[in-house]
């Protein structure tokens, strides 16, 4: 389980050409990774360095999950708004 969390994709810098080629995770996958990170952060034997690395990874997962949720909300709003051109 520990190794699985660190296999998540890092957010590439915005200028990286490979950003579009990186596999995308679903909202549920991001939430699952975040839940795993929270479980690990509760481990009293976790070192400070590992805890900080895990926290950074968890924050990335949270950010990406929030973006997916925001995009879904915007898409829902778009579908609910009648097209004025029609």
Curated annotation (Swiss-Prot):
Gene Ontology cellular component list: cytoplasm; exodeoxyribonuclease VII complex
Chief place where the protein resides: cytoplasm
Pfam family membership, one: Exonuc_VII_S
Reactions catalysed according to its record: Exonucleolytic cleavage in either 5'- to 3'- or 3'- to 5'-direction to yield nucleoside 5'-phosphates
Enzyme Commission number: 3.1.11.6
GO biological process: DNA catabolic process
Keywords: Cytoplasm, Exonuclease, Hydrolase, Nuclease
Origin: domain of life: Bacteria
Region feature Disordered, mapped onto this chain: 1-27
Molecular function in Gene Ontology: exodeoxyribonuclease VII activity
Subcellular location: Cytoplasm
Function text: Bidirectionally degrades single-stranded DNA into large acid-insoluble oligonucleotides, which are then degraded further into small acid-soluble oligonucleotides.
Assembly behavior: Heterooligomer composed of large and small subunits.
NCBIfam families for the chain: PRK14065.1, xseB
Protein family per UniProt: Belongs to the XseB family.
Protein name: Exodeoxyribonuclease 7 small subunit
Gene: xseB
